[in-house]
Structures are given as structure tokens and as C-alpha cells.
């Protein structure tokens, strides 16, 4: 089971569960909707994963810990002050029922991480559909390196970003694909139509796949740091 629970203005809380096992929660932007959903599902929780320190991913931690004090909350070092109980900057997390790869994807924040669980990539604000996160650290090399790590994963990887930014990202992608192939242009246009339909029905545009992102995401297509940096700076003022 994979479910994107809308939160705040455009966040998603991702919930992942193998059949008949406790679930994993990715990021805690808020808790009211989450607690209602968990109660309705009569869910048990294996762990919480925090991708980075920003408030719109962590401001629900305090309330969550009061209600579920024994559930481990994993996150990078920067999330310790936000309430993470288990610090993970890279490597693997082994819980009772899951093996989780921790992939460094800094740049948006210094210690941002992404989590890979059963071919599901929970990438926070590192990678979006047709886009990537702003480089608030100013370290474009760190951001580019993190995206390159994600770009080595298989095509069938299911990509679960933390925000509903897809339409705006596709609009930018269309402006920078003028020199791209007809196949790539067609993929962007086709995805834009799909996303417009989804959003008109108040449905998520996500998840996506790494195969699709390789076709429509200019930041994954960037071959050099210089190309990536120019794209990101252009998107900042788009």
C-alpha cells in the first residue's frame, strides 16, 4: 500500500506498507489529518522517516511523539533538534520488517536524505516530478551529486516527492526543451495533460517513476554541474 496524504498547502505525507505489516510514514508536516487517517485505518506504525529539517516536514514531530512515544523517528543529523530519535545520514536502516536505504541528497539543506524502501524512493525536496528542490545551501555541486545518485536507480523506481509542484515544473520544462528531441517534448506534453486532469479532480499527480522523470525532468537530464546550475538558477526566477 502506498498513499499520499495531502498536508498543509501542497505537501504530501507518504505512507507505505507491505500487506499485513506496520506502515512507514515519511515526513510530518502536520498531524491532524494524519491521526484521523491512522485511526480510520486502525494502523500500526513501524517507523517515521524525516528527509530534512524544514518546518513543513517536521513541525508535526512533537505532537506525533506525544501520541506515539515508542515509534522510532529516523532522520539526518540536522533533524535531531526537530525531534528525530535515530540519526541516519547514509547507509541502511534495518527495522523489524523493512530494509531502508538512506541516500545523501544534500543541497536543498546540507544533510537532506532520501529513503529507498522496496523500490519506492521517498525523496523529500531533493527531486520533484519534472523538477528539483531549490538549492538553499548555495552548494549546487552537492545538489547535483545527490541527484546523480538518484539517477543511478532503476527505471522502475517509484518516485514519491514531498510536494505537488508538478504543473509548474512541467511549464518550466517545456521552455527548456526547445532543443530536445520530439520524443521528450511529447512526453512532457502528455504528462502535462495527465497532471491537469488529475489536479482538476483534486487528485495527486504523484507518484511518478524514474523512467518518466528521465524523459521529462531537465535536472536529471543535465550532464554537467554547469548545466545543472544554469537550469536551477533559471527555474528560481521562472
Curated annotation (Swiss-Prot):
Its cofactor is Zn(2+). Zn(2+) 1 binds at residues 52, 54, 108, 125. One of its GO terms (biological process) is methylglyoxal catabolic process to D-lactate via S-lactoyl-glutathione. The keyword Hydrolase applies. It catalyses: an S-(2-hydroxyacyl)glutathione + H2O = a 2-hydroxy carboxylate + glutathione + H(+). It comes from Haemophilus influenzae (strain ATCC 51907 / DSM 11121 / KW20 / Rd). Zn(2+) 2 binds at residues 56-57, 125, 163. Monomer. Keywords: Hydrolase, Metal-binding, Zinc. Belongs to the metallo-beta-lactamase superfamily. Glyoxalase II family. The keyword Metal-binding applies. It holds the Pfam family Lactamase_B. Its EC number is 3.1.2.6. One of its GO terms (molecular function) is metal ion binding. Pathway: Secondary metabolite metabolism; methylglyoxal degradation; (R)-lactate from methylglyoxal: step 2/2. Binds 2 Zn(2+) ions per subunit. This is Hydroxyacylglutathione hydrolase. Thiolesterase that catalyzes the hydrolysis of S-D-lactoyl-glutathione to form glutathione and D-lactic acid.
